[in-house]
């Protein structure tokens, strides 16, 4: 969207609020950044702009989707970067801005390393594609948006991207813009929960939600970048079920754990949900021809791709990453996340972006659809009231999930027969057996009886027994 003056832009924006919000990207506020230079725009193809988007252009692209599909979208921010740029999210849902009980929440995050630019652009293209196809009545996309709350964050590191994009010429330095403006590698900056869970595996301790009730500690930690803190709060505040973090520099779908148990540089380190994570990674790689090609040569001559299988890898088997976002999601919340490396080049020429879109379009859709697998349902008391933070345990898998505020839960699983137990403080636990197909998710609801209700019930039974005995024996 080109700027043509205030009045014309007001018409294009469609509302004063949208116009003011969009113009805010170009203004230097008190202590605010210069957002980045504008460039001549390329024409769209099928409603998608196959080009790099600097910060103002990224905002324009998201606003354009929002205005085009206003009934099923909204834009919000989870915070600001170190230099003050907003960490923007486009949400797509039939009821935007609201968590609908029983509807799972999904997120994509791109551009965590600012110089890894393909993921940033693919997520902008994805937002445009979903909006366009929804309006065309594409049944797959309509069903996806109506039954999933989708959150798309094109750039977690907008400062790093601006630095990388400011380099002259098509050949970009391998490291310029990787870190945030403070020089912090965001994918080494999250609390190292792997080390905690590895200790708990040996000595006993919780296997999930390891940051429960510790938000203040996150805020007070001066070693955490503002981008990291913003995403931690986002993860903790929304009941995400599934996520992918888009990177560049190779071609592979990477799954937990990312950090080795022994501390070695390379070692397969499976998490309790290794089976479903392998399946999730394949759901992405199998639709990407270059990624899943068994004969694809390594991106660089000396690269070690020996851990790659069908375009997937266990993260720690490839190389150990402490403090990564992927494992943080799994160990701090109910969210299962993989990391996808999209391109051998980190900042490839602009004319190649359309090819990357064609390689990844079906994978991006397929991966969102994986959220509708396994088991889902509600945990309530006998009066039908939701029980939040109930624990859902699967026999044989040492990783629990918890119910959200409406009592709703989602548990991703590969096909098979399982024993699922729901429990909550003050309630009697209930176990149920369930046969899980590949998809869709099987609904299993739980009604838990409180200890106080059980005591009253036992008291009434005792009184009835005493009354019967009294009448029988003529007391």
UniProtKB/Swiss-Prot annotation:
Q: Which residues are glycosylated?
A: 138, 389
Indicate the secretion signal residues: 1-27
**UniProt binding sites for Zn(2+):** 113, 116, 247
Active site as annotated: 341 (proton donor/acceptor)
Q: How does this chain sit within the bilayer?
A: Peripheral membrane protein
Q: How is the cofactor bound?
A: Binds 1 zinc ion per subunit.
Peptidase M14 domain sequence ranges: 51-371
Q: Which residues form a coiled coil?
A: none
Q: Which keywords belong to this entry?
A: Carboxypeptidase, Cleavage on pair of basic residues, Cytoplasmic vesicle, Glycoprotein, Hydrolase, Membrane, Metal-binding, Metalloprotease, Protease, Secreted, Signal, Zinc, Zymogen
Tell me the cofactors it needs. Answer: Zn(2+)
Which ranges are cleaved off as propeptide? 28-41
Q: Which reaction(s) are listed as its catalytic activity?
A: Release of C-terminal arginine or lysine residues from polypeptides
Keyword DNA-binding in annotation: no
Q: Name one GO cellular component term.
A: transport vesicle membrane
Is Transferase one of the keywords UniProt gives this record?
no
Q: What is its EC number?
A: 3.4.17.10
GO: which molecular function terms?
A: cell adhesion molecule binding; metallocarboxypeptidase activity; neurexin family protein binding; zinc ion binding
Q: What is the protein's quaternary organization? A: Interacts with secretogranin III/SCG3.
User: So what family is this one in?
Assistant: Belongs to the peptidase M14 family.
What this chain does, per the record? Answer: Sorting receptor that directs prohormones to the regulated secretory pathway. Also acts as a prohormone processing enzyme in neuro/endocrine cells, removing dibasic residues from the C-terminal end of peptide hormone precursors after initial endoprotease cleavage.
Q: What is this protein called?
A: Carboxypeptidase E
Encoding gene (name): CPE
